[in-house]
Amino acid sequence: MKDAKSAILGHHEAINKQDTEEYLATIKFPFTYQNFNGVALTAETAQDYKDRLEMPWEIIKRTEKEWAYSSLDLLEEVARSESSVVFKVAASRINNSGDTDIAIHAIWIAVKTDGTWGIQFRHNLGKPV
């Protein structure tokens, strides 16, 4: 990706498309996902991710059976360096009827390595309070 914001948008789009290869292409490894309940999972490579971890849409559909896609409601840059940008993300999970099942907040970090940007860390904060 050419910049940090494009990396975030591409990552989000790949999740909505449920496209494994496109999703993995948006990631910089090692990649860590941390959930609101304290679980942290790290994949060292794309193959490691495929072998050991579920794709995000599989996790979402386990708890939200009628999930159709997620809307990106807010993308706010929080901090930046030359090689890393931290974003606050607010998203809504939309069901097959077009209604919002749940709204979440998250922190996504994009990093630049080898001249391209990708997502290296995603923390789902859960429901906003």
Language-model-derived ranges and their functions:
Residues 1-26, 33:
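Short, low-complexity N-terminal intrinsically disordered segments enriched in polar/charged residues
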Residues 16, 80-82, 112:
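Surface-exposed coil/turn segments at beta-strand junctions on protein surfaces, enriched
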Residues 21-75, 83:
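A solvent-exposed, acidic/Ser-Thr-rich amphipathic alpha-helical stretch
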Residues 32, 88-94:
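Generic short beta-strand segments
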Residues 71-78, 91-93, 105-111, 124:
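Hydrophobic/aromatic beta-strand elements that line small-molecule binding cavities or substrate pockets
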